Amino acid sequence: VIKSGGKTRRAAKMVILNVDHPDVVDFIDCKSKEEKKAWALIDAGYDGSFTGEAYGSVFFQNSNNSVRVTDEFMDAVVRDRVWHTRSVTTSAIAETHRARDLWHSIAESAWLCGDPGLQYDTTVNSWHTSPNSGRINASNPCSEYMFLDDSACNLASLNLRKFQDATNELDIASFKAAVQVTILAQEIVVDFAKYPTERIGANSHLFRPLGLGYANLGALLMARGLPYDSDAGRAYAAAITSLMCGEAYAHSARIARDSTGPCEGWAANRDPFLGVLEKHRRQCDLIDAAYVPYNLMQAAKQSWDDSIKLGRDHGIRNSQVTVLAPTGTIGFMMDCDTTGVEPDIA
């Protein structure tokens, strides 16, 4: 049994199965079946706490399970078509299912026990900054970091409430400065970190992926009087996220310009990398500006314009720069009222 730091937080892992795998039906409901067993044990009087006997007696409790779906599968769901699972080694058809039956099973199991999650393979790879070096097949345990196999990402998060001024507006200058300082610090950490395998270490230095994110979004929205589930809340969150990501890429390009040059993986991926930055810029224009302060919206657009121009001229030092981690542990050490991007939990 592995317990992180000797405490009750168990080591995490992500388990992913492609939606065309022959075992996908069993995989979809494996955790929900174990959840029902735990309920029965709790009803029989066993301890149902996180570290209690009930959940300690059932399987699959130390992993996050996700089904990897493609646009082809999602189209089959929408059009109510059949879906074939295929042999991994020969690609021969193994079984045929109604796509919507698989979809409903995924939804029911996720509703019952939280798993499986979904990873949208086609979308993930369409936003891949380094596709010429390999495709993205998987993620880290919490699914915020997706990149090449055998790679690693050091994470950092900012408490958004600390950047609100007396009128609950975002202090844009301070936020951008924090992004710049943190990206530089994370870039330095890449060379000082220890890696579990030689291959992970090599890729981390070739591509230098970083994971800057934020926490306390739910509290930020409450302080502004914005419902979490609202167009206004989503637009405001999108603008902040866009500003953070755009400024992080822009500063990564400044580091490449002023210090050490782009990462080694840049040369082979320059065109698709710049294409992803341009996609981000176009998405920024789609944020509903009616719900976002003008200066925040303009700052986000300017950061993306800067990242594209600097990237074209000098390259980018880091193949990825932002993630949105759940911050389930560090969020409370950071004086957050809510964790990650989540609302206040009842």
Give residue spans per PLM region.
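Gly/Pro-rich active-site capping loops and adjacent beta-alpha segments
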Residues: D165, S319, I330-M333, D337-A346
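Core structural elements
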Residues: I183-V190, N203-G225
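Short secondary-structure subsegments characteristic of cysteine-rich extracellular domains
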Residues: D231-Y249
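Glycine-rich phosphate/pyrophosphate-binding loops
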Residues: R10-V15, A223-A232
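Short, surface-exposed loop/turn segments at secondary-structure junctions
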Residues: T197-S204, P227-A235
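Active-site cavity-forming subdomains of large catalytic enzyme subunits
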Residues: V1-A177, D191-N203, A248-Y291, M297-A299, ...
